[in-house]
Amino acid sequence: MATVSTNEFKGGLKLMLDNEPCVILENEYVKPGKGQAFNRVKIRKLLSGKVLEKTFKSGDTCEVADVMDIDLDYLYSDGEFYHFMNNETFEQIAADAKAVGDNAKWLVENNTCMITLWNGNPITVTPPNFVELEVTDTDPGLKGDTQGTGGKPATLSTGAVVRVPLFIAIGEVIKVDTRTAEYVGRVK
C-alpha cells in the first residue's frame, strides 16, 4: 500500500486509520519552541461519520486509503436502496441508506452525484453542490409584510425544508445549495 508522510497532509486526503478509511478535514502544523514538531489533524471516519482530532509526530507516515471517487447519475430509490448509474459503462450501483445519510433529501433523478467506493462498496454519496427543486408547500407571502427579514420555511419536492424569501410561492422552482441547505435563487 502507498504511504504518505505528515508533511504531505492536506484537506481532502484520504487515509487508513484503525483499518477504517478517513478523510482529513483540517490540518495544522505546530512547531513548539521546545520539543518536536507535530501535526494536529481533524479527521472524519468515512464509515461512521464520526469527527475526531488526532496528532501525528512530524515525519510519521500513514497508509493512504484505497478509496475511489466516481461520478454517477442518480436513477431512483426502491425504499431500501438508492440506485446510481455510470453514464459511460451503464453499470449500476446500489447504495444503502447509511451511505446516503441526510443527503437523500437532495437527490434528484438524473443529477450527477459523487460516490466514494471502498472495496467496491459505496460508503458515502455526495450530491451536487446546487440542485433545482420545486416548492410544494409554503405560507403565502402577504403584500407589504416586511416585518421579518428571515423569510419563511418552504417544503421542497424531495421533502427538504429550507428558508426562502417572502415572494416565493408554491409551484416555483428554486436553486438550493446542498452544502448549507440555503436558498440561492429562483430558476427562470
From Swiss-Prot:
- Cell compartments where the protein resides: Cytoplasm
Q: Does the keyword Protein biosynthesis apply?
A: yes
Q: Which GO terms describe its cellular component?
A: cytoplasm
- Main location, first listed in the record: cytoplasm
Task: Point out residues bearing the modification N6-(3,6-diaminohexanoyl)-5-hydroxylysine.
Answer: K34
Q: What is a single molecular function from GO for this protein?
A: translation elongation factor activity
- Might you name a Gene Ontology BP term for this protein? peptide biosynthetic process
Identify the metabolic or biological route this protein is part of: Protein biosynthesis; polypeptide chain elongation
Show the InterPro entries listed in the entry: Elong-fact-P_C (IPR015365), NA-bd_OB-fold (IPR012340), Rib_uL2_dom2 (IPR014722), Transl_elong_fac_P/YeiP (IPR020599), Transl_elong_KOW-like (IPR013185), Transl_elong_P/YeiP_cen (IPR001059), Transl_elong_P/YeiP_CS (IPR013852), Transl_elongation_fac_P (IPR011768)
On modification after translation, the UniProt record reads: May be beta-lysylated on the epsilon-amino group of Lys-34 by the combined action of EpmA and EpmB, and then hydroxylated on the C5 position of the same residue by EpmC (if this protein is present). Lysylation is critical for the stimulatory effect of EF-P on peptide-bond formation. The lysylation moiety may extend toward the peptidyltransferase center and stabilize the terminal 3-CCA end of the tRNA. Hydroxylation of the C5 position on Lys-34 may allow additional potential stabilizing hydrogen-bond interactions with the P-tRNA.
Keyword terms, alphabetized: Cytoplasm, Elongation factor, Hydroxylation, Protein biosynthesis
Q: Which HAMAP family match?
A: EF_P (MF_00141)
Which family does the similarity line name? Answer: Belongs to the elongation factor P family.
- PANTHER family linked: ELONGATION FACTOR P (PTHR30053), ELONGATION FACTOR P (EF-P) FAMILY PROTEIN (PTHR30053:SF12)
NCBIfam families in alphabetical order:
efp, PRK00529.1
Q: What does this protein do?
A: Involved in peptide bond synthesis. Alleviates ribosome stalling that occurs when 3 or more consecutive Pro residues or the sequence PPG is present in a protein, possibly by augmenting the peptidyl transferase activity of the ribosome. Modification of Lys-34 is required for alleviation.
Q: What's the protein here called?
A: Elongation factor P
Species of provenance: Vibrio campbellii (strain ATCC BAA-1116)
